[in-house]
Amino acid sequence: MFARAVSRKTMTGLLAGSRVLLASQFTMADRQVHTPLEPVQRQKYANNENLLKDHVEKIDPEVFNIMKNEKSRQRRGLELIASENFTSKAVMDALGSAMCNKYSEGYPGARYYGGNEFIDQMEILCQKRALEVFGLDPAKWGVNVQSLSGSPANFAVYTALVGANGRIMGLDLPDGGHLTHGFFTPARKVSATSEFFQSMPYKVDAQSGLIDYDKLEENAMLFRPKVLIAGVSCYARHLDYERFRKIATKAGAYLMSDMAHISGLVAAGLIPSPFEYSDVVTTTTHKSLRGPRGAMIFYRKGVRSVNAKGVETLYDLEEKINSAVFPGLQGGPHNHTIAGIAVALKQCLSEDFVQYGEQILKNAKTLAERLKKHGYSLATGGTDNHLLLVDLRPIGVEGARAEHILDLAHIACNKNTCPGDVSALRPGGIRLGTPALTSRGFKEQDFEKVGDFIHEGVQIAKKYNAEAGKTLKDFKAFTATNEQFKQEVAELAKRVEEFSGKFEIPGNDLF
Protein backbone atom coordinates (compact mmCIF):
# COMPACT_ATOMS: atom_id res chain seq x y z
CA MET A 1 0.00 0.00 0.00
CA PHE A 2 2.90 2.32 0.71
CA ALA A 3 4.09 1.97 -2.88
CA ARG A 4 0.64 2.91 -4.20
CA ALA A 5 0.37 5.98 -1.91
CA VAL A 6 3.44 7.77 -3.22
CA SER A 7 4.29 9.01 -6.67
CA ARG A 8 6.95 7.38 -8.83
CA LYS A 9 9.09 10.53 -8.51
CA THR A 10 8.84 10.47 -4.72
CA MET A 11 9.65 6.75 -4.64
CA THR A 12 12.71 7.30 -6.83
CA GLY A 13 13.95 10.01 -4.46
CA LEU A 14 13.39 7.82 -1.42
CA LEU A 15 15.28 4.93 -2.99
CA ALA A 16 18.17 7.16 -4.02
CA GLY A 17 18.42 8.58 -0.51
CA SER A 18 18.32 5.10 0.93
CA ARG A 19 21.21 4.05 -1.29
CA VAL A 20 23.33 6.97 -0.10
CA LEU A 21 22.48 6.23 3.52
CA LEU A 22 23.14 2.52 3.14
CA ALA A 23 26.39 3.16 1.31
CA SER A 24 27.62 5.42 4.11
CA GLN A 25 26.56 2.88 6.71
CA PHE A 26 28.32 0.04 4.92
CA THR A 27 31.46 2.13 4.54
CA MET A 28 31.55 2.81 8.27
CA ALA A 29 30.65 -0.76 9.21
CA ASP A 30 33.16 -2.17 6.79
CA ARG A 31 35.96 -0.68 8.87
CA GLN A 32 34.59 -2.18 12.06
CA VAL A 33 33.36 -5.62 11.03
CA HIS A 34 36.78 -7.29 11.17
CA THR A 35 38.59 -7.02 14.49
CA PRO A 36 41.70 -9.23 14.36
CA LEU A 37 43.49 -10.24 17.53
CA GLU A 38 46.66 -8.75 16.09
CA PRO A 39 46.92 -5.84 13.63
CA VAL A 40 46.98 -7.03 10.02
CA GLN A 41 49.91 -5.67 8.03
CA ARG A 42 48.68 -4.66 4.58
CA GLN A 43 51.10 -4.61 1.70
CA LYS A 44 50.98 -1.77 -0.80
CA TYR A 45 52.06 -2.92 -4.23
CA ALA A 46 54.16 -0.64 -6.37
CA ASN A 47 52.48 1.20 -9.21
CA ASN A 48 54.15 -1.05 -11.79
CA GLU A 49 52.80 -4.25 -10.21
CA ASN A 50 49.52 -5.79 -11.33
CA LEU A 51 48.06 -8.28 -8.86
CA LEU A 52 46.09 -10.13 -11.51
CA LYS A 53 48.51 -10.10 -14.44
CA ASP A 54 52.07 -10.30 -13.15
CA HIS A 55 53.85 -13.63 -12.73
CA VAL A 56 54.39 -15.18 -9.31
CA GLU A 57 58.11 -14.33 -9.41
CA LYS A 58 57.20 -10.64 -9.26
CA ILE A 59 54.08 -10.78 -7.09
CA ASP A 60 55.26 -13.27 -4.48
CA PRO A 61 59.04 -13.89 -4.45
CA GLU A 62 58.73 -15.90 -1.23
CA VAL A 63 56.44 -18.52 -2.77
CA PHE A 64 58.41 -18.40 -6.02
CA ASN A 65 61.65 -19.22 -4.22
CA ILE A 66 60.11 -22.19 -2.40
CA MET A 67 58.79 -23.57 -5.70
CA LYS A 68 62.15 -22.96 -7.36
CA ASN A 69 63.95 -24.74 -4.51
CA GLU A 70 61.64 -27.73 -4.80
CA LYS A 71 62.33 -27.90 -8.53
CA SER A 72 66.04 -27.78 -7.75
CA ARG A 73 65.67 -30.59 -5.21
CA GLN A 74 63.91 -32.74 -7.78
CA ARG A 75 66.56 -32.00 -10.39
CA ARG A 76 69.62 -32.71 -8.25
CA GLY A 77 68.25 -35.80 -6.50
CA LEU A 78 67.09 -39.29 -7.38
CA GLU A 79 63.32 -39.70 -7.01
CA LEU A 80 62.68 -43.37 -6.26
CA ILE A 81 59.33 -43.10 -4.47
CA ALA A 82 57.17 -45.60 -6.35
CA SER A 83 54.05 -43.41 -6.29
CA GLU A 84 55.78 -40.33 -7.74
CA ASN A 85 56.48 -39.20 -11.27
CA PHE A 86 57.26 -36.11 -13.34
CA THR A 87 54.28 -34.90 -15.34
CA SER A 88 54.68 -33.17 -18.68
CA LYS A 89 54.84 -29.50 -19.60
CA ALA A 90 51.58 -29.94 -21.52
CA VAL A 91 49.79 -31.24 -18.42
CA MET A 92 51.16 -28.32 -16.39
CA ASP A 93 49.84 -25.94 -19.05
CA ALA A 94 46.37 -27.39 -18.52
CA LEU A 95 46.67 -27.12 -14.74
CA GLY A 96 47.51 -23.43 -15.00
CA SER A 97 44.74 -22.62 -17.48
CA ALA A 98 41.46 -20.71 -17.23
CA MET A 99 39.74 -24.03 -16.51
CA CYS A 100 40.61 -23.48 -12.84
CA ASN A 101 38.23 -20.49 -12.66
CA LYS A 102 34.99 -22.35 -13.33
CA TYR A 103 32.50 -23.87 -10.92
CA SER A 104 30.54 -26.78 -12.42
CA GLU A 105 28.72 -28.87 -9.83
CA GLY A 106 26.96 -31.75 -11.52
CA TYR A 107 27.76 -33.64 -14.71
CA PRO A 108 27.83 -32.80 -18.43
CA GLY A 109 24.40 -31.64 -19.50
CA ALA A 110 23.14 -31.45 -15.91
CA ARG A 111 25.01 -28.68 -14.10
CA TYR A 112 23.91 -26.46 -11.23
CA TYR A 113 25.65 -23.43 -12.78
CA GLY A 114 25.54 -21.77 -16.16
CA GLY A 115 28.43 -21.16 -18.52
CA ASN A 116 29.59 -24.78 -18.73
CA GLU A 117 29.64 -25.33 -22.49
CA PHE A 118 33.38 -25.91 -22.68
CA ILE A 119 33.62 -27.52 -19.26
CA ASP A 120 31.18 -30.15 -20.52
CA GLN A 121 33.22 -30.60 -23.69
CA MET A 122 36.38 -31.15 -21.67
CA GLU A 123 34.85 -33.68 -19.27
CA ILE A 124 33.25 -35.65 -22.10
CA LEU A 125 36.57 -35.65 -23.99
CA CYS A 126 38.39 -36.85 -20.88
CA GLN A 127 35.88 -39.68 -20.39
CA LYS A 128 36.12 -40.68 -24.05
CA ARG A 129 39.90 -40.85 -23.91
CA ALA A 130 39.87 -42.77 -20.62
CA LEU A 131 37.75 -45.53 -22.16
CA GLU A 132 39.84 -45.52 -25.33
CA VAL A 133 43.17 -45.80 -23.47
CA PHE A 134 42.08 -48.98 -21.70
CA GLY A 135 40.26 -50.46 -24.70
CA LEU A 136 36.79 -50.29 -23.15
CA ASP A 137 33.44 -50.43 -24.96
CA PRO A 138 31.33 -47.36 -23.98
CA ALA A 139 28.25 -49.59 -24.04
CA LYS A 140 29.76 -51.79 -21.32
CA TRP A 141 31.84 -49.32 -19.29
CA GLY A 142 31.49 -45.80 -17.95
CA VAL A 143 33.96 -43.60 -16.10
CA ASN A 144 33.80 -40.80 -13.54
CA VAL A 145 36.74 -38.39 -13.81
CA GLN A 146 35.74 -35.97 -11.03
CA SER A 147 37.26 -37.63 -7.95
CA LEU A 148 39.93 -35.38 -6.48
CA SER A 149 42.41 -38.19 -5.77
CA GLY A 150 42.65 -41.91 -5.16
CA SER A 151 41.48 -41.99 -1.55
CA PRO A 152 38.21 -40.08 -2.23
CA ALA A 153 37.67 -42.26 -5.31
CA ASN A 154 37.88 -45.46 -3.28
CA PHE A 155 35.70 -44.00 -0.55
CA ALA A 156 33.10 -43.03 -3.15
CA VAL A 157 32.96 -46.62 -4.41
CA TYR A 158 32.43 -47.98 -0.90
CA THR A 159 29.78 -45.34 -0.24
CA ALA A 160 27.98 -46.30 -3.44
CA LEU A 161 28.17 -50.08 -3.18
CA VAL A 162 28.60 -50.97 0.47
CA GLY A 163 26.77 -48.37 2.53
CA ALA A 164 27.40 -47.40 6.14
CA ASN A 165 28.88 -50.21 8.22
CA GLY A 166 28.97 -52.55 5.22
CA ARG A 167 31.82 -54.99 4.65
CA ILE A 168 34.95 -54.60 2.54
CA MET A 169 38.01 -56.82 2.21
CA GLY A 170 41.45 -55.67 1.05
CA LEU A 171 45.13 -56.53 1.34
CA ASP A 172 46.51 -55.64 4.76
CA LEU A 173 48.63 -52.47 4.75
CA PRO A 174 51.75 -54.13 6.26
CA ASP A 175 51.50 -56.77 3.52
CA GLY A 176 51.42 -54.26 0.67
CA GLY A 177 47.87 -52.91 0.69
CA HIS A 178 46.72 -49.32 1.06
CA LEU A 179 45.22 -47.27 3.88
CA THR A 180 41.98 -46.89 1.95
CA HIS A 181 41.50 -50.65 1.73
CA GLY A 182 40.26 -50.72 5.32
CA PHE A 183 43.40 -50.58 7.46
CA PHE A 184 43.08 -50.60 11.23
CA THR A 185 45.16 -51.65 14.23
CA PRO A 186 44.13 -53.23 17.55
CA ALA A 187 44.39 -49.76 19.09
CA ARG A 188 42.49 -47.65 16.57
CA LYS A 189 40.78 -47.41 13.21
CA VAL A 190 43.48 -45.65 11.22
CA SER A 191 41.62 -45.00 7.97
CA ALA A 192 38.14 -43.56 7.45
CA THR A 193 37.39 -46.72 5.48
CA SER A 194 37.70 -48.77 8.66
CA GLU A 195 35.80 -46.12 10.62
CA PHE A 196 32.70 -46.12 8.41
CA PHE A 197 32.89 -49.65 7.01
CA GLN A 198 33.67 -53.05 8.49
CA SER A 199 36.91 -54.36 7.02
CA MET A 200 38.77 -57.64 7.13
CA PRO A 201 42.27 -57.85 5.65
CA TYR A 202 43.73 -60.68 3.65
CA LYS A 203 47.44 -61.45 3.90
CA VAL A 204 50.52 -62.56 2.02
CA ASP A 205 52.46 -65.68 2.88
CA ALA A 206 55.18 -64.65 5.34
CA GLN A 207 57.80 -66.79 3.59
CA SER A 208 57.13 -66.18 -0.10
CA GLY A 209 55.66 -62.69 0.22
CA LEU A 210 52.92 -63.72 -2.24
CA ILE A 211 49.18 -63.32 -1.67
CA ASP A 212 47.71 -66.44 -0.10
CA TYR A 213 44.69 -66.86 -2.39
CA ASP A 214 43.49 -70.04 -0.69
CA LYS A 215 43.33 -68.34 2.69
CA LEU A 216 41.77 -65.28 1.05
CA GLU A 217 38.99 -67.44 -0.38
CA GLU A 218 38.43 -69.20 2.93
CA ASN A 219 38.13 -65.92 4.83
CA ALA A 220 35.99 -64.27 2.14
CA MET A 221 33.44 -67.07 2.45
CA LEU A 222 33.29 -66.49 6.20
CA PHE A 223 33.28 -62.68 6.14
CA ARG A 224 31.10 -62.23 3.03
CA PRO A 225 32.28 -58.74 2.01
CA LYS A 226 30.13 -56.58 -0.23
CA VAL A 227 33.29 -55.41 -2.03
CA LEU A 228 36.49 -57.43 -2.50
CA ILE A 229 39.46 -55.20 -3.34
CA ALA A 230 42.23 -56.34 -5.68
CA GLY A 231 44.77 -53.59 -5.22
CA VAL A 232 48.17 -52.83 -3.76
CA SER A 233 50.57 -50.05 -2.88
CA CYS A 234 53.66 -52.20 -2.36
CA TYR A 235 53.43 -55.56 -4.09
CA ALA A 236 55.90 -56.34 -6.84
CA ARG A 237 54.06 -59.17 -8.59
CA HIS A 238 51.07 -59.38 -10.92
CA LEU A 239 47.69 -59.91 -9.32
CA ASP A 240 45.66 -62.96 -10.32
CA TYR A 241 42.50 -61.10 -11.34
CA GLU A 242 40.83 -64.27 -12.58
CA ARG A 243 41.21 -65.86 -9.15
CA PHE A 244 39.95 -62.68 -7.50
CA ARG A 245 36.88 -62.79 -9.77
CA LYS A 246 36.07 -66.37 -8.84
CA ILE A 247 36.40 -65.60 -5.13
CA ALA A 248 34.25 -62.47 -5.42
CA THR A 249 31.53 -64.32 -7.32
CA LYS A 250 31.56 -67.18 -4.83
CA ALA A 251 31.30 -64.76 -1.89
CA GLY A 252 28.61 -62.65 -3.57
CA ALA A 253 30.83 -59.56 -3.70
CA TYR A 254 31.62 -56.88 -6.22
CA LEU A 255 35.25 -57.01 -7.38
CA MET A 256 36.90 -53.60 -7.21
CA SER A 257 40.42 -53.37 -8.63
CA ASP A 258 42.58 -50.48 -7.47
CA MET A 259 45.24 -50.10 -10.16
CA ALA A 260 46.55 -46.72 -8.98
CA HIS A 261 50.21 -47.75 -9.08
CA ILE A 262 50.17 -49.75 -12.29
CA SER A 263 47.60 -47.97 -14.49
CA GLY A 264 50.29 -46.53 -16.77
CA LEU A 265 51.64 -50.01 -17.43
CA VAL A 266 48.11 -51.33 -18.01
CA ALA A 267 47.46 -48.43 -20.42
CA ALA A 268 50.62 -49.34 -22.33
CA GLY A 269 49.43 -52.94 -22.62
CA LEU A 270 52.48 -54.29 -20.80
CA ILE A 271 50.96 -56.06 -17.78
CA PRO A 272 47.67 -57.89 -17.11
CA SER A 273 44.58 -55.67 -17.14
CA PRO A 274 42.00 -55.85 -14.35
CA PHE A 275 39.10 -54.82 -16.57
CA GLU A 276 38.18 -58.27 -17.90
CA TYR A 277 37.33 -59.52 -14.43
CA SER A 278 36.35 -56.43 -12.42
CA ASP A 279 33.05 -54.72 -11.71
CA VAL A 280 34.74 -51.45 -10.74
CA VAL A 281 38.29 -50.20 -11.37
CA THR A 282 39.79 -47.16 -9.65
CA THR A 283 43.06 -45.42 -10.35
CA THR A 284 44.97 -42.29 -9.58
CA THR A 285 46.29 -40.38 -12.56
CA HIS A 286 49.66 -39.13 -11.30
CA LYS A 287 51.71 -42.29 -10.74
CA SER A 288 52.81 -44.43 -13.68
CA LEU A 289 50.03 -42.81 -15.76
CA ARG A 290 52.09 -39.60 -15.48
CA GLY A 291 49.22 -37.12 -15.33
CA PRO A 292 48.11 -34.54 -12.74
CA ARG A 293 47.04 -35.44 -9.22
CA GLY A 294 43.55 -36.81 -9.76
CA ALA A 295 41.60 -40.05 -10.06
CA MET A 296 39.16 -42.00 -12.20
CA ILE A 297 36.45 -44.54 -11.34
CA PHE A 298 35.51 -47.03 -14.06
CA TYR A 299 32.27 -48.97 -13.64
CA ARG A 300 30.50 -51.66 -15.63
CA LYS A 301 27.25 -51.11 -17.51
CA GLY A 302 24.78 -53.49 -19.11
CA VAL A 303 24.24 -57.13 -18.15
CA ARG A 304 25.76 -58.31 -14.89
CA SER A 305 24.50 -61.89 -14.87
CA VAL A 306 21.98 -64.29 -16.39
CA ASN A 307 20.25 -66.91 -14.25
CA ALA A 308 19.31 -70.48 -15.20
CA LYS A 309 15.99 -69.27 -16.62
CA GLY A 310 17.70 -66.75 -18.87
CA VAL A 311 16.65 -63.73 -16.83
CA GLU A 312 19.20 -60.92 -17.00
CA THR A 313 20.36 -58.84 -14.06
CA LEU A 314 21.67 -55.43 -15.09
CA TYR A 315 24.38 -53.36 -13.47
CA ASP A 316 23.14 -50.28 -11.61
CA LEU A 317 26.54 -48.81 -10.77
CA GLU A 318 26.54 -45.61 -12.83
CA GLU A 319 23.93 -43.69 -10.86
CA LYS A 320 25.20 -44.96 -7.52
CA ILE A 321 28.84 -44.07 -8.14
CA ASN A 322 28.17 -40.71 -9.76
CA SER A 323 25.85 -39.75 -6.90
CA ALA A 324 28.44 -40.84 -4.34
CA VAL A 325 31.05 -38.57 -5.92
CA PHE A 326 28.64 -35.66 -6.34
CA PRO A 327 26.73 -34.62 -4.35
CA GLY A 328 27.67 -37.33 -1.86
CA LEU A 329 31.31 -36.53 -1.14
CA GLN A 330 32.31 -33.55 -3.26
CA GLY A 331 31.09 -30.24 -4.59
CA GLY A 332 32.44 -28.73 -7.78
CA PRO A 333 35.08 -30.75 -9.64
CA HIS A 334 38.56 -29.39 -10.35
CA ASN A 335 38.17 -28.65 -14.04
CA HIS A 336 41.83 -27.75 -14.58
CA THR A 337 42.72 -31.21 -13.27
CA ILE A 338 40.23 -32.88 -15.61
CA ALA A 339 41.87 -30.95 -18.46
CA GLY A 340 45.27 -32.20 -17.32
CA ILE A 341 44.00 -35.78 -17.15
CA ALA A 342 42.66 -35.45 -20.70
CA VAL A 343 46.09 -34.32 -21.91
CA ALA A 344 47.84 -37.16 -20.07
CA LEU A 345 45.42 -39.70 -21.56
CA LYS A 346 46.19 -38.49 -25.07
CA GLN A 347 49.87 -39.02 -24.31
CA CYS A 348 49.04 -42.57 -23.19
CA LEU A 349 47.85 -43.30 -26.73
CA SER A 350 51.30 -42.59 -28.19
CA GLU A 351 54.09 -45.03 -29.10
CA ASP A 352 56.39 -42.93 -26.91
CA PHE A 353 54.27 -43.82 -23.88
CA VAL A 354 54.55 -47.54 -24.62
CA GLN A 355 58.33 -47.20 -24.88
CA TYR A 356 58.34 -45.33 -21.56
CA GLY A 357 56.38 -48.18 -19.97
CA GLU A 358 58.76 -50.77 -21.38
CA GLN A 359 61.69 -48.84 -19.96
CA ILE A 360 60.04 -48.68 -16.51
CA LEU A 361 59.96 -52.49 -16.43
CA LYS A 362 63.52 -52.87 -17.74
CA ASN A 363 64.79 -50.38 -15.18
CA ALA A 364 62.97 -52.09 -12.31
CA LYS A 365 64.47 -55.46 -13.18
CA THR A 366 67.91 -53.91 -13.59
CA LEU A 367 67.71 -52.22 -10.19
CA ALA A 368 66.50 -55.45 -8.61
CA GLU A 369 69.39 -57.45 -10.04
CA ARG A 370 71.94 -54.80 -9.06
CA LEU A 371 70.76 -54.77 -5.46
CA LYS A 372 70.74 -58.56 -5.31
CA LYS A 373 74.31 -58.49 -6.61
CA HIS A 374 75.16 -56.28 -3.63
CA GLY A 375 73.67 -58.96 -1.37
CA TYR A 376 70.23 -57.54 -0.64
CA SER A 377 67.07 -59.59 -0.25
CA LEU A 378 63.94 -58.57 -2.15
CA ALA A 379 60.40 -59.41 -1.10
CA THR A 380 59.01 -62.08 -3.48
CA GLY A 381 62.54 -62.36 -4.91
CA GLY A 382 62.15 -59.68 -7.57
CA THR A 383 59.57 -57.65 -9.49
CA ASP A 384 57.05 -57.86 -12.33
CA ASN A 385 56.16 -54.17 -12.31
CA HIS A 386 57.57 -50.75 -11.48
CA LEU A 387 58.53 -51.28 -7.84
CA LEU A 388 60.59 -53.45 -5.55
CA LEU A 389 60.65 -53.95 -1.80
CA VAL A 390 64.13 -54.26 -0.32
CA ASP A 391 64.24 -56.30 2.90
CA LEU A 392 66.92 -54.79 5.16
CA ARG A 393 66.28 -57.02 8.16
CA PRO A 394 69.06 -59.50 7.23
CA ILE A 395 71.66 -56.73 7.56
CA GLY A 396 70.16 -55.28 10.75
CA VAL A 397 69.10 -51.87 9.42
CA GLU A 398 65.57 -50.55 9.90
CA GLY A 399 63.78 -49.07 6.93
CA ALA A 400 63.31 -45.68 8.61
CA ARG A 401 67.05 -45.33 9.19
CA ALA A 402 67.90 -46.25 5.62
CA GLU A 403 65.28 -43.79 4.34
CA HIS A 404 66.78 -41.01 6.46
CA ILE A 405 70.36 -41.59 5.29
CA LEU A 406 69.35 -41.87 1.65
CA ASP A 407 67.33 -38.67 1.94
CA LEU A 408 70.40 -36.85 3.26
CA ALA A 409 72.23 -38.14 0.19
CA HIS A 410 69.46 -36.77 -2.10
CA ILE A 411 67.96 -40.21 -2.79
CA ALA A 412 64.21 -40.14 -2.09
CA CYS A 413 62.50 -43.41 -1.17
CA ASN A 414 60.21 -44.55 1.63
CA LYS A 415 60.39 -46.99 4.50
CA ASN A 416 58.02 -49.93 4.16
CA THR A 417 56.95 -53.00 6.06
CA CYS A 418 58.12 -56.38 4.80
CA PRO A 419 56.20 -59.67 5.01
CA GLY A 420 56.51 -60.98 8.54
CA ASP A 421 57.28 -57.62 10.17
CA VAL A 422 56.16 -57.63 13.79
CA SER A 423 55.48 -53.89 13.97
CA ALA A 424 54.31 -51.49 11.27
CA LEU A 425 55.92 -48.72 13.33
CA ARG A 426 59.39 -50.19 12.74
CA PRO A 427 59.32 -51.36 9.12
CA GLY A 428 62.11 -53.60 7.94
CA GLY A 429 62.50 -52.42 4.37
CA ILE A 430 62.43 -49.66 1.80
CA ARG A 431 60.21 -49.36 -1.26
CA LEU A 432 61.78 -48.25 -4.54
CA GLY A 433 60.12 -47.35 -7.84
CA THR A 434 61.39 -46.53 -11.32
CA PRO A 435 58.73 -44.36 -13.10
CA ALA A 436 60.05 -40.92 -12.09
CA LEU A 437 63.65 -41.48 -13.14
CA THR A 438 62.48 -43.27 -16.27
CA SER A 439 60.60 -40.08 -17.18
CA ARG A 440 63.93 -38.26 -16.86
CA GLY A 441 65.51 -40.57 -19.41
CA PHE A 442 67.30 -43.09 -17.17
CA LYS A 443 68.18 -46.38 -18.87
CA GLU A 444 69.41 -49.73 -17.54
CA GLN A 445 73.05 -48.70 -17.14
CA ASP A 446 71.93 -45.63 -15.20
CA PHE A 447 69.92 -47.75 -12.79
CA GLU A 448 72.96 -49.90 -12.15
CA LYS A 449 74.61 -46.71 -10.89
CA VAL A 450 71.49 -45.86 -8.88
CA GLY A 451 71.71 -49.28 -7.25
CA ASP A 452 75.32 -48.59 -6.32
CA PHE A 453 74.37 -45.28 -4.71
CA ILE A 454 71.62 -46.95 -2.69
CA HIS A 455 74.07 -49.60 -1.53
CA GLU A 456 76.54 -46.94 -0.39
CA GLY A 457 73.86 -45.12 1.57
CA VAL A 458 72.58 -48.25 3.29
CA GLN A 459 76.13 -49.27 4.19
CA ILE A 460 76.66 -45.89 5.86
CA ALA A 461 73.49 -46.50 7.87
CA LYS A 462 74.77 -49.95 8.83
CA LYS A 463 78.20 -48.59 9.80
CA TYR A 464 76.81 -46.12 12.34
CA ASN A 465 73.74 -48.13 13.33
CA ALA A 466 74.99 -49.45 16.66
CA GLU A 467 76.51 -46.26 18.04
CA ALA A 468 73.69 -43.99 16.86
CA GLY A 469 71.21 -45.07 19.54
CA LYS A 470 68.22 -47.39 19.82
CA THR A 471 65.47 -45.07 18.62
CA LEU A 472 65.00 -43.24 15.33
CA LYS A 473 65.07 -39.96 17.27
CA ASP A 474 68.48 -40.88 18.69
CA PHE A 475 69.67 -41.91 15.24
CA LYS A 476 68.64 -38.60 13.67
CA ALA A 477 70.24 -36.64 16.50
CA PHE A 478 73.48 -38.54 15.98
CA THR A 479 73.48 -37.98 12.22
CA ALA A 480 72.95 -34.25 12.75
CA THR A 481 76.01 -33.87 14.98
CA ASN A 482 78.62 -36.52 14.12
CA GLU A 483 81.14 -34.84 11.83
CA GLN A 484 82.61 -38.02 10.36
CA PHE A 485 79.17 -39.25 9.41
CA LYS A 486 78.19 -35.88 7.94
CA GLN A 487 81.33 -35.86 5.82
CA GLU A 488 80.66 -39.33 4.41
CA VAL A 489 77.05 -38.51 3.54
CA ALA A 490 78.02 -35.14 2.02
CA GLU A 491 80.53 -36.87 -0.23
CA LEU A 492 77.90 -39.34 -1.42
CA ALA A 493 75.34 -36.55 -1.89
CA LYS A 494 77.80 -34.62 -4.04
CA ARG A 495 78.30 -37.57 -6.39
CA VAL A 496 74.55 -38.17 -6.54
CA GLU A 497 73.98 -34.52 -7.51
CA GLU A 498 76.65 -34.65 -10.21
CA PHE A 499 75.14 -37.80 -11.67
CA SER A 500 71.51 -36.65 -11.48
CA GLY A 501 72.34 -33.25 -12.94
CA LYS A 502 73.16 -34.85 -16.29
CA PHE A 503 69.50 -35.66 -16.92
CA GLU A 504 66.67 -33.39 -18.02
CA ILE A 505 63.62 -32.92 -15.83
CA PRO A 506 60.12 -32.54 -17.37
CA GLY A 507 57.81 -29.61 -16.73
CA ASN A 508 58.58 -25.93 -16.24
CA ASP A 509 62.21 -24.87 -16.37
CA LEU A 510 62.26 -22.83 -13.15
CA PHE A 511 59.49 -24.30 -11.05
From Swiss-Prot:
The modification N6-(pyridoxal phosphate)lysine is found at K287. It holds the Pfam family SHMT. InterPro entries: PyrdxlP-dep_Trfase, PyrdxlP-dep_Trfase_major, PyrdxlP-dep_Trfase_small, Ser_HO-MeTrfase, Ser_HO-MeTrfase-like, Ser_HO-MeTrfase_PLP_BS, SHMT-like_dom. It catalyses: (6R)-5,10-methylene-5,6,7,8-tetrahydrofolate + glycine + H2O = (6S)-5,6,7,8-tetrahydrofolate + L-serine. GO terms for molecular function: glycine hydroxymethyltransferase activity; pyridoxal phosphate binding. SUPFAM superfamilies: PLP-dependent transferases. It comes from the Eukaryota. GO terms for cellular component: cytoplasm; mitochondrion; nucleus. Its EC number is 2.1.2.1. One of its GO terms (biological process) is tetrahydrofolate metabolic process. Keywords: One-carbon metabolism, Pyridoxal phosphate, Transferase. Its cofactor is pyridoxal 5'-phosphate. HAMAP family: SHMT. PANTHER family: SERINE HYDROXYMETHYLTRANSFERASE (PTHR11680), SERINE HYDROXYMETHYLTRANSFERASE, CYTOSOLIC (PTHR11680:SF59). Homotetramer. Belongs to the SHMT family. Interconversion of serine and glycine. This is Serine hydroxymethyltransferase. It comes from Caenorhabditis briggsae.
